[in-house]
Amino acid sequence: MKARIWMVGIAVVALVLVLSGGWLWRGAVASSPLAEKVNYDDQGRLLFPQDWRRWVLVGSSLGLGYSDREGPAGQQAFHHVLMEPSAFQHFERTGEFAEKTMFALAIYSQGSRESIARAGSYTKDLMAVEIALKDSERFDEGWAYFGFGTGRPASQAIDQSGCWSCHNQHGQRDNVFMQFYPVLREADPTAGR
C-alpha cells in the first residue's frame, strides 16, 4: 500500500512539473517574437518590417497635426497607427510596452469624389511609413523613431530632438500617444486602477 501511495505521489509531482514546464515554455515562446521582429543591418540601421500591414490597428486620424504649420485644409493626410501583434498581446496582458515593441505610422493621402464616391473622403495612396521602436539596449532614451518613406529598406534613428522629444513630452504613457489610440485604451488591463 505504501508503495502505491508513493507511486501516486511521484505521478502527481511529475504531472505538476510537466504542466509548469509547459507554462514556462509558453511564456518563453510568447516573448521571443518581439526580439525576432527587430532587425538591424551592419550599419546599425533598422530594417523595414515587411509584415507591418498585418499588425493591429490601434488608432487612426485625419489631418492630426502637432504644429500650426501643417498642410492646408483639404490636403489632410490619414494616419493609421498599427502595433506589432506580439507586442499588442503583451500589452493586453500587462498594460506595459515590452522591449522591442514596434508601432508603424502609415501616412496616406486623402481621396474623394472618385468612382462612386460623391461625399466624404477615403484613404488613398501611401505617402510614408514611420516606425517607433522601444529598444533600451540600443538607445539610451528607450524609444527611437525611424522614417522609411514609401520604400526605403533601412533607416537610421531620427534625431532625438524630433519625434522622441515630442513623444517624451506629450505621450500619455511611456512615450506612446495613448490619448489617440482607443484600441490600446480599451485593451489596457490597468485601466481604472
Residue ranges and their predicted role:
Residues 10-20:
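Hydrophobic membrane-insertion alpha-helices, especially the h-region
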Residues 32, 38-41, 48-56, 60, ...:
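Sequence context surrounding c-type heme c attachment/ligation sites in exported
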Residues 77-88:
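Short, structured beta-strand/loop micro-motifs enriched in basic residues and often containing a Trp
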